[in-house]
C-alpha cells in the first residue's frame, strides 16, 4: 500500500514509528506536512497538491493532526476522503472528538460514565453552576486546551467563582467538572485500535499536581484494566467513530468515568511503558480494514 502520514514534523516519535512500522511491512510511507498541502476543491476530480505537484496513488492516510491545526488538518483529510483514500481516522470523527463539549454530549447520550459537567455563558449563573457539579473542590477546563493547559483545580467555591469570572471576562469557553478525589491524581490511558484495547497504562500526576499528563511531568506505569473499563473505552471510541483512540478514564467510586477521547494519541508513552509494538498494530489494522473508496462515515452526531 502507498500510505500518507499527515504530520507537521517527520522527526516526532509517533510519526517516525508509524513510518518505520509501515516500511517494515513493505508499504510505501510518505510524510506530508499538513499545512503545506493545498486543494483544488471545485474540480470534477478532487485533488490535493503538495510542493507544486498533485498527490496521487495513495491507498490510505494516517492523520497525525495537532490540536492547533484541527480545522485545516480536517479539511485536508476530508479532501483525501473525497479522492477515495481510506483514512485511519476519518475527518468528521476527529472534529467530533476535538470539540470537548460535543464529545461529552454524545458520550452522555449513550450512557457512558462521565464526571458531572456544567457549561454556562452568563456570570449570573456561576453559583448555580458550581452547585450543579456538587460544589468545590471542582475542576475548570478551557474547551480549547490540550496537554493539561487551561485546567484549574479550585479548592473552594469562592476561588471557583473568581476563576470562572476571569475566564468569562476573557471570552474563553469553559466547562466545570466535579473533582474525582478518589482517583488520586491518576488516570488510565486505554489505547484502542479497531475493536480491541491493545494496551493500557496508568498515568500518575507528580506530587503536588493533579494533572496526570506526561507532558506535565506525570509518570506512566503498567496497569491491568477491568472488563468494565475495557468496555467503556471501546464504547467511547465507537461513539466518536474513531478506529484508533486514546481513551482517558478515571477510576471513581461509581465506576469508570471518561475524561477525554483523543483522536491522535501519542505512541511514545504507551510503547515505552508496555513494550508493545503499537505502531505495527496500527499498520496491521490499516491492512485489514483499509482500501480504496472505503470511506463510509462512522459514528453519529
UniProtKB/Swiss-Prot annotation:
Mn(2+) 1 binds at residues 248, 260. GO terms for molecular function: ATP binding; metal ion binding; ribosomal S6-glutamic acid ligase activity. Its cofactor is Mg(2+); Mn(2+). The keyword Ion transport does not apply. Mg(2+) 2 binds at residues 260, 262. It comes from the Bacteria. Keywords: ATP-binding, Ligase, Magnesium, Manganese, Metal-binding, Nucleotide-binding, Protein biosynthesis. Pfam families: RimK, Rimk_N. Its EC number is 6.3.2.-. Mg(2+) 1 binds at residues 248, 260. One of its GO terms (biological process) is translation. Belongs to the RimK family. This is Probable alpha-L-glutamate ligase. It comes from Pseudomonas fluorescens (strain Pf0-1). The gene is rimK.
Amino acid at each position: 500500500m502507498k500510505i500518507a502520514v499527515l504530520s507537521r514534523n517527520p522527526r516526532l516519535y509517533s510519526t517516525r514509528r508509524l513510518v518505520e512500522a509501515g516500511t517494515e511491512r513493505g508499504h510505501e510511507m510518505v510524510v506530508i506536512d499538513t499545512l503545506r498541502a493545498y486543494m483544488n476543491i471545485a474540480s470534477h476530480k478532487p485533488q490535493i497538491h503538495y510542493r507544486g505537484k498533485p498527490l496521487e496513488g495513495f491507498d490510505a492516510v494516517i492523520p497525525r493532526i495537532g490540536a492547533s491545526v484541527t480545522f485545516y488538518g480536517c479539511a485536508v483529510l476530508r479532501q483525501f476522503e473525497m479522492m477515495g483514500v481510506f483514512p485511519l481516522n476519518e475527518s468528521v470523527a476527529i472534529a467530533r472528538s476535538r470539540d470537548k463539549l460535543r464529545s461529552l454530549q454524545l458520550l452522555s447520550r449513550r450512557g457512558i460514565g462521565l464526571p458531572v459537567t456544567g457549561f454556562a455563558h452568563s456570570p449570573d449563573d456561576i453559583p448555580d453552576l458550581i452547585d450543579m457539579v456538587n460544589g468545590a473542590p471542582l475542576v475548570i477546563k478551557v474547551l480549547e486546551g490540550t496537554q493539561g493547559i487551561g485546567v484549574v483545580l479550585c479548592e473552594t467555591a469562592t476561588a471557583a467563582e473568581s476563576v470562572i469570572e476571569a475566564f468569562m471576562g476573557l471570552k474563553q469557553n469553559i466547562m466545570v467538572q466535579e473533582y474525582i478525589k478518589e482517583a488520586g491524581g491518576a488516570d488510565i490511558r486505554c489505547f484502542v485500535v479497531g475493536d480491541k484495547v491493545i494496551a493500557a497504562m496508568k498515568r500518575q500526576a507528580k506530587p503536588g499536581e493533579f494533572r496526570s499528563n506526561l507532558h506535565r511531568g506525570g509518570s506512566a506505569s503498567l496497569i491491568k484494566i477491568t472488563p468494565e473499563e475495557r468496555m467503556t473505552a471501546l464504547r467511547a471510541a465507537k461513539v466518536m467513530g474513531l478506529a484508533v483512540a486514546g481513551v482517558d478514564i478515571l477510576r471513581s467510586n461509581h465506576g469508570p468515568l471518561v475524561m477525554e477521547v483523543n483522536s491522535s494519541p501519542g505512541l511514545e508513552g504507551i510503547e515505552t511503558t508496555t513494550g508493545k509494538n503499537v505502531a505495527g498494530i496500527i499498520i496491521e489494522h490499516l491492512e485489514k480494514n483499509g482500501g480504496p473508496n472505503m470511506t463510509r462515515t462512522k459514528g453519529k452526531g
